[in-house]
Design a protein with these regions (language model features):
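Conserved HGGG/HGGXW glycine-rich cap/lid loop of the alpha/beta-hydrolase fold
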Residues: 8-57
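Catalytic histidine-centered segment of alpha/beta-hydrolase-like enzymes
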Residues: 196-205
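Short beta-strand/loop motif that positions the catalytic acidic residue
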Residues: 159, 165-167
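Conserved alpha/beta-hydrolase "nucleophile elbow" surrounding the catalytic nucleophile
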Residues: 27, 85, 89-90
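Active-site loop/oxyanion-hole signature of alpha/beta-hydrolase fold enzymes
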Residues: 48-86, 210
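Flexible "cap/lid" loop of the alpha/beta hydrolase fold
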Residues: 95, 99-102, 110-136
Length: 217
């Protein structure tokens, strides 16, 4: 299915019944990373697994910015008239969720995994790897990770949604960055998942579905 927002087409799959749950993937991925999780969540939620702009079956873009992606999600919720929304974002999707929840009161529960506030919120080895990729190939997805996000911790104080901040103990995001996010959102809960990496409990995994249902139901 497609929704027209901000002059582009966002592709999404709608599955299940119940409270709306928006799920947004990370950089260079698409909605299919959530297939296994949606299969579990569909009995409790209406899942909207979305391809963000420049990804999957959504409109391609020559240049990408997290703020634009966040505005897309806000417009998506408005277009479909979704209220009392659970927003789950992984990696880049988590960044988008933080930006959207600052101003969108349709989001009443926010769960983010492996998000960062600044490019240096990732570990040094990952930044070196991304820099090398940028030398080999000019790609808006790589450029996005190199120059963004640029979120000040103080900006997160406007988030009113009940928030759960997640990361793996072996995540490519620095733990100090994850803790800073949680500390900057009023009332946020923090969970560092022992033994998990950036996407091990999310990508084609039912583990994230178990975490979400435990937290929300």
């Amino acid at each position: 299915m497609y929704a027209g927002v901000n002059g582009i087409q966002l592709y999404y799959q709608k599955t299940g019944r119940g409270r709306p749950l928006i799920m947004v993937h990370g950089n260079s991925e698409d909605h299919t990373i959530f297939d296994e999780a949606v299969n579990v969540l569909k009995d409790h939620f209406t899942c909207y697994a979305i391809d963000s702009r420049g990804h999957g079956q959504s409109s391609p873009c020559r240049e990408l910015h997290y703020d634009d992606m966040a505005q897309d999600m806000i417009a998506f919720m408005t277009e479909l008239d979704l209220e009392n929304v659970v927003f789950y974002g992984f990696s880049d999707g988590g960044i988008v969720g933080l930006l959207a929840a600052r101003q969108c009161r349709r989001i009443t529960d926010l769960i983010v995994s492996g998000a960062n506030l600044k490019p240096n919120g990732t570990k040094a080895w990952f930044r070196i790897m991304v820099a090398g990729m940028g030398l080999v190939k000019k790609d808006p997805l790589i450029e996005l990770m190199q120059r963004e996000p640029n979120i000040e911790p103080s900006e997160l104080s406007s988030i009113k949604a009940r928030t759960l901040v997640l990361a793996g103990s072996k995540d490519l995001i620095r733990e100090a960055e994850t803790r800073k996010i949680a500390e900057s959102i009023p009332g946020a809960e923090l969970r560092i998942l022992d033994g998990e990496s950036h996407g091990s409990y999310i990508v084609h995994s039912e583990k994230i579905a178990e975490i979400l249902t435990e937290h929300l139901l």
